[in-house]
Amino acid sequence: MSLLSLPWLGLRPVATSPWLLLLLVVGSWLLARILAWTYAFYNNCRRLQCFPQPPKRNWFWGHLGLITPTEEGLKNSTQMSATYSQGFTVWLGPIIPFIVLCHPDTIRSITNASAAIAPKDNLFIRFLKPWLGEGILLSGGDKWSRHRRMLTPAFHFNILKSYITIFNKSANIMLDKWQHLASEGSSRLDMFEHISLMTLDSLQKCIFSFDSHCQERPSEYIATILELSALVEKRSQHILQHMDFLYYLSHDGRRFHRACRLVHDFTDAVIRERRRTLPTQGIDDFFKDKAKSKTLDFIDVLLLSKDEDGKALSDEDIRAEADTFMFGGHDTTASGLSWVLYNLARHPEYQERCRQEVQELLKDRDPKEIEWDDLAQLPFLTMCVKESLRLHPPAPFISRCCTQDIVLPDGRVIPKGITCLIDIIGVHHNPTVWPDPEVYDPFRFDPENSKGRSPLAFIPFSAGPRNCIGQAFAMAEMKVVLALMLLHFRFLPDHTEPRRKLELIMRAEGGLWLRVEPLNVSLQ
């Protein structure tokens, strides 16, 4: 037993135990951490004063409840972007600040920063990790850089060309369903429901060369993909379920675990089968067989990819990238197509001009087949797609965590450790960037009108090193499907105005309903 004596404080020697010493050490450590955090917090508050701040609800809630994933919340967000057009600070409660950037000049420093300086913030997308693994969406550092380089050939134009046939087939299956429904008197359809199923059908063929006929009959795999997306979205809205140990004890957590296992088993089975086929045939014979079918699918490209050192991707890596493509490719494209149909339904003059452009292009040709070279011959349709993506970007926000101080062009500094929100919808609705931003005007994207505009004024697929690797795939699919839809149907507004709803992507509450009228297709 040691004696603790502090005579200079007038205290008598007292006996001390190891527990008391441990308590003193732990207490001192906690006090030091609290003081360090307090200093850093107030230092950041001081440094953030250069960013304006919208009025809070109160000191405790901060701006919580003002920016919500609802129509009202999105309106509040775009209003803030209009008022504070160079960016602003919002507080999630009393101690968590975010910097919201909503102008091309201010987002440039973040989007152009390396993935090491401004990596993705994993606050919510970490819920996807048990499903998507260390794919390109969730990985970071050297692994992300290596995978990004190895995946780039999978989205080369020569590969994308072969997917056009798949886009045509999947779109025509959906349009035949619509013809059948219209003949039975059902002219009011939820665009999200039908188009999501069509994009999943296309992706399953492009990634796995597998046709589940999911648009014609139920598919367990496709139903599981939809279930996983819904469970991730539901989890993000319940604070207690953010803790893994609580979530996986819940009914939803067990459902999520089972669904992940089913999806992984499907992907693993495809990879194993290809691994068996490849060494048996040899690479040359493998390519010859693929040339006959005119399709080199995503799994094929990943199996054949090698990095600078000649190393291939592991089966686990291939599964992660295939599952990531399946997740990232269906909802975003479905959102983009659904909203462009909504905008064209509200502007029949633009819809008719797009239709005439497609009719002229396909004159004396098969009205159910769009070819790769046709995509460059649809300038007005492309302008309409881009203007819809401006008004209704599928992913309205992207978050980045600053690992070091980042200096903006105007001299303001975003402190290290602060999370930045790249407000894509704010940039797209910023009146200092886009005059009359709420008006749907495809002519904004006329080449003459685009001269001098910042490339960061329009970023539906993000920008910089971590932009969407599949954007060419998405644009090609949207243009093919939209051309075929406009050729065979007229789209009219529903009697109810949709209310935007932000989930994993931009949706509409209760679905996005439009009325469809079959057209008599004659291109002679």
Swiss-Prot record:
It comes from the Eukaryota. The chain crosses the membrane at residues 19-39, 87-107. Pathway: Lipid metabolism; arachidonate metabolism. Keywords: Endoplasmic reticulum, Fatty acid metabolism, Heme, Iron, Lipid metabolism, Membrane, Metal-binding, Microsome, Monooxygenase, Oxidoreductase, Transmembrane, Transmembrane helix. It is an enzyme of class 1 (oxidoreductase). Its EC number is 1.14.14.1. It catalyses: an organic molecule + reduced [NADPH--hemoprotein reductase] + O2 = an alcohol + oxidized [NADPH--hemoprotein reductase] + H2O + H(+); (5Z,8Z,11Z,14Z)-eicosatetraenoate + reduced [NADPH--hemoprotein reductase] + O2 = 18-hydroxy-(5Z,8Z,11Z,14Z)-eicosatetraenoate + oxidized [NADPH--hemoprotein reductase] + H2O + H(+); (7Z,10Z,13Z,16Z,19Z)-docosapentaenoate + reduced [NADPH--hemoprotein reductase] + O2 = 10,11-epoxy-(7Z,13Z,16Z,19Z)-docosatetraenoate + oxidized [NADPH--hemoprotein reductase] + H2O + H(+); (7Z,10Z,13Z,16Z,19Z)-docosapentaenoate + reduced [NADPH--hemoprotein reductase] + O2 = 13,14-epoxy-(7Z,10Z,16Z,19Z)-docosatetraenoate + oxidized [NADPH--hemoprotein reductase] + H2O + H(+). One of its GO terms (molecular function) is monooxygenase activity. InterPro entries: Cyt_P450 (IPR001128), Cyt_P450_CS (IPR017972), Cyt_P450_E_grp-I (IPR002401), Cyt_P450_sf (IPR036396), Cytochrome_P450_Monoox (IPR050196). Heme binds at C468. This is Cytochrome P450 4F12. It comes from Homo sapiens.
